[in-house]
Amino acid sequence: MKPQIYHVDAFTGDPFRGNSAGVVLHADTLSDAQMQLIARELRHSETAFLLKSEESDVRIRYFTPTVEVPICGHATVAAHYVRATVLGLGNTTVWQTSLAGRHRVEIHAEHNDYRITLEQGQPSFEPPLVGEIRAAIITALNLTEDDIVPGAPIQVASTGHAKVMILLKPDVDIDALSPNLAALTAISQQIGCNGFFPFQIRPGKNETDGRMFSPAIGIVEDPVTGNANGPMGAWLVHHGLMAHDGKTLQIQGHQGRALGKEGTVDVTVTIRDNQPENVTISGQAVILFHAEWAITF
């Protein structure tokens, strides 16, 4: 069967919002080079290629327009939304394998639609970025030290695909950020992390607003990022920066407003001994169109 290509908006229930992803079904016959060419042609921040797997229900590979990445939150939501729709799934648990490992995905059938919940990887944190590197990140984002929440480190956090966490004061106009992309690319090469996630907490709410810049891997700005909002939740627990009941923390991560692509990632962090133990992200999706690949490689 020829590969089937879907254009999906993830982390939204409305078309033309959220984060668009390519989803390619029946990708088993495609080579690495062909997958990269397709991802480059589709020009989504990530395209997910679904393949058969002997150890899971499905294997997924993820490509930006320029490089393969371990995993991608919004493309995972998009991929399982398409798969559930095509197969007519009900409420079920699916296991997927990717370069980031083996993860559980929950398919929730609701109101003749689906909500997808992805269990992310174990939260991890690198030492805070300090001194010249910290200053360079702040400068590259066209911010000042006064824009950063006092006592909040600038730090790489990961639940599978690492991002740099930068917590801004609530009065910073996050939509007005205009980073120096060349500088961010150079910093990425220095620190070994390609995503920068400045965000802020809405006062008195378990809600955040963020933006994610990743020019080093061909993504100027990602509209709505599961692999940023998930580790963000873990990072907030790790540093005691958002109140919780000691068992779970639930956050609505808002993103994409500056691009006119608003979307929401529902983040749940399970907690043990006041530290993050497990992270899930959840969201909706919309299929805009699908097509069959017409050419033969």
From Swiss-Prot:
Designated name of the protein: Uncharacterized isomerase YddE
Gene name tied to this protein: yddE
Disulfide bonds: none
Record GO biological process: biosynthetic process
Species lineage: Bacteria, Pseudomonadati, Pseudomonadota, Gammaproteobacteria, Enterobacterales
Species name: Salmonella typhimurium (strain LT2 / SGSC1412 / ATCC 700720)
Similarity comment: Belongs to the PhzF family.
InterPro entries registered for this protein in UniProt: Phenazine_PhzF-like
EC number: 5.1.-.-
A Pfam entry, by short name: PhzC-PhzF
